[in-house]
Amino acid sequence: VEKRYLEEQQIIEDSFRLGVQIFESGFRPTFIVGLWRGGSAVGIYVQECLQTLGVQTDHIALRTSYPGLPDYQNMVETPERIRVHGTQYLIENLNIDDGLLIVDDVFSSGHNITAVINRLSTKLKRNMPEEVRIATLYQRTGYNRTTLKPDFCLHETSDWLVFPYELKGLSHEEIAANKPYVAPYLRS
């Protein structure tokens, strides 16, 4: 799999562009959920953008049990093992008439977002918002294993994306070549 290393500035700019895309669509979320890790950062920028454009939202990050690149294939093969953590606030506050926006950095297999929606639906029952939308910076083409698809997306790619904060699953050589600013800190 080809790895593509992303720069922080591009993620920031794309996150604001994603916020504008959501705003221009007419969708007005009342809750934004950023999926920890990458989706939480994107969610912060989207929330700030929407707030500046006059859309007030409640916002929170949720975490799934997906640990990253080394475990990707296991997650694809056994999606029922994905756990969703940190839903209590949403369970206590979401209602059927809320607009829920789920934000992630990359939409790949769709299993993580499916796990979040299933967990919320199970707990909220009739209070599950009727309007649930998905926003992501990237969609990995050909990897979706669900019936979901992003409602808002900026880029399609088949590359494995490596975000600026990611180190797990990278060799020392890859870090030295693609993240030279980090390499000196990792020498023991």
Name the predicted role of every residue range:
Residues 1-188:
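PRPP-associated nucleotide enzymes
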